[in-house]
């Protein structure tokens, strides 16, 4: 009767460990456009605009992308430049159009338009950084426009993301050093603020936006490696549970495997907690970039802006919900792992206990003294 009972305990632990690991599969989607385009995103974002600074920025970027698209065609990079239809808006770079939805995941993202996926691609080790996703999409579309290099669209995206990273770091350093010189260069490039207009100066707004972009870049790199580490530990947890079951089939009491079972389950929950917390913090950060409509009685201005860069619409994806379900299973696994490990761990032998008691008891000579 003892063996079936041990087998049932091990079976429950194995099912839980396998279930939590299977729920990591959605985290690896949104990476491939070939075949069935599966995507269970952590978040979905759309560029919609909100504050005056964000609207001006989006309008400028759209016009710049339109110019780049025309240059890509006119410079002979496309072999279809004689066809007038290639100049139509739907054939140009449309990254910042409000009908485009980006589905973000740890290892890649998908671009969706009118409920149909345009493409999915891996995002290397850059994680879910929204701005890098948008930059990569611009590079991929430029690669698609230049049809003579249509097989190198991923290289276009990679090179543009690398350029963005270098440019962001340089601009951040430039604005920080220029701040100590009275923003002389910034005023020359951006323009001096109107003294009659109250509010934050354009220079401070742009510095705030650059700092926010830099923080998002660094933070998402950390979240990416947390996610990779969590998947590795989740797989190791299956191996430990399997080894624990093999040990139970040989004998009832053990020392090493119960300790490994408790350690692996504890480490898994700790790393999963860090990943979940990082995702929640990132969601809150993205929500600060989302316009908030507030209806005030007697107020003409209904929009309240917190950062000056409200330009995104953010929603939680199915992958985030599955991550919460996986996290709950990992907690159940942790509790059962501790109960099973404590129940089946080897108890100290009587000889060992007698030796310990003897070493701790005072000698007769000391008692006489």
Swiss-Prot record:
The keyword Iron does not apply. Keywords: Endoplasmic reticulum, Membrane, Sporulation, Transmembrane, Transmembrane helix. It comes from the Eukaryota. Residues 1-6, 242-265, 341-369 are cytoplasmic. Residues 348-369 are annotated as: Disordered. Belongs to the SMA2 family. Involved in spore and ascus formation. Required for the efficient assembly of the precursors of the prospore membrane to a continuous prospore membrane. This is Spore membrane assembly protein 2. It comes from Saccharomyces cerevisiae (strain ATCC 204508 / S288c) (Baker's yeast).
């Amino acid at each position: 009767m003892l063996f079936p009972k041990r087998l049932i305990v091990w079976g429950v632990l194995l099912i839980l460990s396998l279930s939590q690991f299977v729920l990591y599969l959605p985290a690896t989607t949104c990476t491939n456009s070939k075949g069935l385009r599966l995507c269970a995103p952590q978040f979905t974002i759309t560029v919609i605009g909100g504050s005056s600074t964000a609207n001006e920025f989006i309008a400028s970027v759209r016009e710049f992308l339109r110019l780049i698209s025309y240059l890509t065609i006119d410079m002979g990079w496309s072999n279809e430049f004689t066809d007038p239809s290639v100049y139509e808006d739907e054939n140009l770079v449309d990254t910042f159009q409000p009908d485009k939805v980006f589905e973000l995941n740890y290892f890649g993202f998908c671009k969706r338009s009118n409920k149909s996926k345009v493409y999915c691609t891996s995002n290397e080790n850059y994680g879910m950084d929204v701005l890098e996703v948008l930059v990569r999409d611009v590079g991929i579309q430029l690669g698609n426009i230049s049809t003579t290099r249509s097989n190198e669209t991923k290289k276009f995206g990679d090179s543009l993301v690398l350029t963005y990273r270098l440019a962001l770091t340089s601009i951040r350093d430039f604005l920080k050093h220029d701040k100590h010189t009275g923003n002389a260069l910034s005023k020359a490039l951006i323009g001096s603020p109107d003294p009659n207009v109250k509010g934050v100066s354009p220079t401070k707004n742009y510095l705030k936006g650059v700092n926010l972009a830099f923080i998002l870049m660094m933070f998402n790199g950390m979240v990416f490696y947390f996610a990779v580490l969590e998947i590795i530990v989740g797989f190791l947890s299956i191996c430990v549970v399997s080894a624990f079951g093999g040990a139970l089939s040989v004998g009832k009491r053990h020392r090493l495997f119960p300790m490994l079972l408790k350690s692996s389950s504890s480490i898994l929950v700790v790393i999963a907690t860090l990943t979940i917390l990082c995702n929640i913090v990132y969601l809150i950060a993205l929500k600060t970039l989302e316009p908030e409509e507030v209806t005030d009685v007697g107020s003409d201005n209904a929009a309240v802006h917190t950062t000056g860069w409200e330009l995104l619409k953010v929603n939680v994806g199915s992958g985030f919900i599955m991550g919460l379900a996986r996290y709950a299973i990992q907690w159940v696994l942790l509790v059962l792992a501790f109960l099973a490990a404590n129940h089946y761990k080897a108890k100290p032998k009587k000889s060992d206990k007698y030796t310990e008691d003897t070493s701790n008891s005072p000698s007769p000579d000391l008692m006489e003294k």
